[in-house]
Amino acid sequence: MSGSSAKINLLGMNRSDLETFFESLGEKKFRATQLMKWMYHLGVSDFDLMTNMSKALREKLKEVAEVSVPEVIYEDISADGTRKWVMRLAGGNSIETVYIPDNGRGTLCVSSQIGCSLDCSFCSTGKQGFNRNLSSAEIIGQLWIAARSFGDYDLSKERYVTNIVFMGMGEPLLNFDNVVRACDVMMDDFGFGISKRRLTVSTSGLVPALDKLGDVTDVSLAISLHAPNNSLRDVLVPVNKKYPIEELLAACHRYLGKLSDKRRITVEYTLIAGVNDSETHAHELRDLLRDLPCKINLIPFNPFPNSGYERPSRNATLRFQKVLSDAGYVATVRTTRGDDIDAACGQLVGRVEDRTRRSQKYIPLQNINVSPDGRASV
């Protein structure tokens, strides 16, 4: 459970931060990696158990610091193996984290904010409004809790959590410093040792922050596109009015150009019945992404109360996918997981807290006009 704010929470500090911390105590830098091994390789949060540190140092740590994680207030496991946690943070707010097992790998979907300010019209989290950014400790705490649940500490053995995606609650690039620091810990061999190819940060398209991200880290990138043209994306993803599709795709090219290896952008496209799921939209998306090294993740919309939107039919989804596949794209349809535990982002925490305000903020489907050429207006 989150502890006293008077003490420094060492969870979520990257190696450089911890070295600076120990130097401030008059200790050598190597204490940082000692501590990281205890926290992340062994799952130990009690300083008294860290026996390769002197008793005097352990007493000093207890005076000024702590290893504090969020409090799990709800946990559920779906029939398909999907697992979801609702975690309470300092101040009483809650976040959610989802684990999805699939074909020999396990993906942990972590949150970066309490709520979200971008107000994408189809997103459950956005309807809850924005409260605050998560600290790096609160981000890493989600992975720490998952690792503890699975006993997932021995890096030499096959692990349950093999992939991490920042696709939970919030826009990661609006919490830039804490997300980057958390990524450092996730990838550090003295942290969780996650490969940069298996750690993905998703963004709705904050172009300046995306350019900055490429200067400080080399994680994999996903963009929440959801529309093949600006008029429709302005409605679904309002940040598009500030950073239109052309600027976003140019930023994606710049990001790939900064990487030391060849990788593709993951393009996320939520299919919404009667809004962006026609073959016209598929052809438009095909042409839009022609020059971008990418793979496309098609996500049938997961309805939530008062969303005003509907999931497309399976036939419509497969027709959309076929247009892209025939053009040579790797286009996968995300299998709906965890329906029996409200595993779609933002759904369960809203039900547990009973605090959502969806009915006041959604754009009703009947208020969106889509022309035959796929353009939209409200």
UniProtKB/Swiss-Prot annotation:
> Matching PROSITE patterns, A to Z?
RADICAL_SAM
What the entry lists under SMART domains is as follows: Elp3
Domain Radical SAM core, by residue range, is: 102-340
Going by the UniProt record, its keywords in alphabetical order are: 4Fe-4S, Cytoplasm, Disulfide bond, Iron, Iron-sulfur, Metal-binding, Methyltransferase, rRNA processing, S-adenosyl-L-methionine, Transferase, tRNA processing
User: In its UniProt entry, what is this protein called?
Assistant: Dual-specificity RNA methyltransferase RlmN
Q: Which cysteines form disulfides?
A: 109-345
Q: Identify the coding gene.
A: rlmN
Major localization listed first in the record, in broad terms? cytoplasm
Give the lineage: Bacteria, Pseudomonadati, Pseudomonadota, Gammaproteobacteria, Oceanospirillales
The species this protein belongs to is Hahella chejuensis (strain KCTC 2396)
Q: Which residues bind S-adenosyl-L-methionine?
A: 170-171, 202, 224-226, 302
